Amino acid sequence: MTQTFADQKRKTVETAEFTEDGRYKRKVRSFVLRTGRLSEFQKNMMNDNWGTLGLDYQTEPFDFAKIYGNDNPVVLEIGFGMGKSLVDMAFANPDKNYLGIEVHTPGVGACIAYAVEKGGTNLRVICHDATEILRDSIADGALGGLQLFFPDPWHKAKHHKRRIVQPHFVAQVVQKLAGNGFIHMATDWENYAEQMLEVLSANTDLVNTSKNGDYIPRPDFRPLTKFEARGHRLGHGVWDLYFVKK
């Protein structure tokens, strides 16, 4: 049976940690590969539009000026889910370039479909482990900002080590940010918000924009996500953090 590009992309993500040279092998992962069904529509969207909207992992830094056709700042979003808020932000901010990373192929397919519907040329998506993209495919100082909205909270204490927001992750992101680049995080888990605040505040290259030294009100430019709406329904608060590189 012939595999389509979308099938191969899913296979690549699912087997990445088992390659013979060990390059993709990681002991602790911040995500779980969900096995949701990739619909025929999503598959077709990926197959038909990957050449214009998709980027593949590579071992040398992306040439963003060539990819986007301009020198506008690049905002990276990790874990965009189904991609609606990412596409909406890209459409609302044509003066910025957006790069989204998601390992869940149905989400990638849905994001591409919505991007095609909305139009615009300032969005690209990647279906790969974000830590490897940061490590190998993005040059130091190349990003205008990082967005991390409602990452997996790994709410059990024994799983907190799996949370993506750790000192080494933040240090890696800061290295990739240009001067005055931002890190914007949001979560509906108070314990995770506290960890985010602690880790971000401990990095001496970052400045908290909160007047109180903790969280900021939800900014108008961040679209309401389904995770945030779920949090409201469950009676959870939502915490936004916005730090800037010195």
Swiss-Prot record:
The active site is at D152. Substrate binds at K156, D188, T225, K226, F227, E228. Its EC number is 2.1.1.33. Keywords: Methyltransferase, S-adenosyl-L-methionine, Transferase, tRNA processing. S-adenosyl-L-methionine binds at E77, E102, D129, D152. InterPro entries: SAM-dependent_MTases_sf, tRNA_(Gua-N-7)_MeTrfase_Trmb, tRNA_methyltr_TrmB_bact. GO terms for molecular function: tRNA (guanine(46)-N7)-methyltransferase activity. Pfam families: Methyltransf_4. Disulfide bonds: none annotated. One of its GO terms (cellular component) is tRNA methyltransferase complex. Pathway: tRNA modification; N(7)-methylguanine-tRNA biosynthesis. It comes from the Bacteria. It catalyses: guanosine(46) in tRNA + S-adenosyl-L-methionine = N(7)-methylguanosine(46) in tRNA + S-adenosyl-L-homocysteine. It is an enzyme of class 2 (transferase). Catalyzes the formation of N(7)-methylguanine at position 46 (m7G46) in tRNA. NCBIfam families: tRNA (guanosine(46)-N7)-methyltransferase TrmB. Belongs to the class I-like SAM-binding methyltransferase superfamily. TrmB family. This is tRNA (guanine-N(7)-)-methyltransferase. The gene is trmB.
